[in-house]
Amino acid sequence: MEADITSQAVGLASNTDFSLWSLFIRADFIVKSVILMLIGCSIYSWAIIIEKFRSFKKINLETEEFEEKFWKSKSAETFYNSLPVNLENPMALLFKDSMQTLLKAKNKSNLNERMSNMLEVNIEKQMVTLEKGFTFLATVGSTAPFIGLFGTVWGIMNSFQSIAISRNTSLAIVAPGIAEALFATALGLLAAIPAVVAYNKFNNDSKKYLQKLENFSKRFLSII
């Protein structure tokens, strides 16, 4: 490792290119691994963010349409029979599963209580599907800055070792190593900030949709 640091220190004085690519190329294996990990986390986070944004928009529009048609229908059974086979909307799936249970129920005693319990289970199942990916966003938001900080600390340690080996404290020796180290911190923040903002937004959207499902369940129970 000392040999690598020595050769790095020798070349730093003549290499003052601070482009992002140059910072990555000059970094050692550990810092490169941190950078690649953070870039990967950021890309996957953005994939989740885009998918969830589209998903919530679609779900909310379909839910409004579903509720409007449902409450205008003659009866729950008539509306159930008119539903398409392939459903994706959580509220539509909740209603479909509930109606299947209701129509198959032979014993009508305590039906409301049993339906209420089943609706709670189905709501939980739909919310688990809806909140898929939330954990990753929360994890990236909370850990990415610390991963970036680790890369920064490691890079600064390498810079100090370069100074000790070269016995040169000039800015040309110190600056490139510090820049590489701070690059990792910047990437950590770049990955974490969108993930935290998106997680908070989607978590709030999820709570609002949960309230919609619970309200629908209560109204549905009142008419069966």
Label the model's feature ranges.
Residues 167-181:
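Hydrophobic alpha-helical transmembrane segments and adjacent short intramembrane/lumenal linkers
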Residues 31-35, 131-141, 180-184:
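N-terminal membrane-entry
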Residues 20-52:
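Hydrophobic alpha-helical transmembrane segments
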Residues 181-195:
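Hydrophobic alpha-helical transmembrane segments of polytopic membrane proteins
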Residues 1-26:
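Short, strongly hydrophobic alpha-helical membrane anchors
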Residues 34-37, 41-44, 144-147, 151-154, ...:
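Residue-level signal for the membrane-embedded core of alpha-helical transmembrane segments
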Residues 57-170, 197-224:
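Predominantly long cytosolic amphipathic alpha-helical stalk/bundle segments
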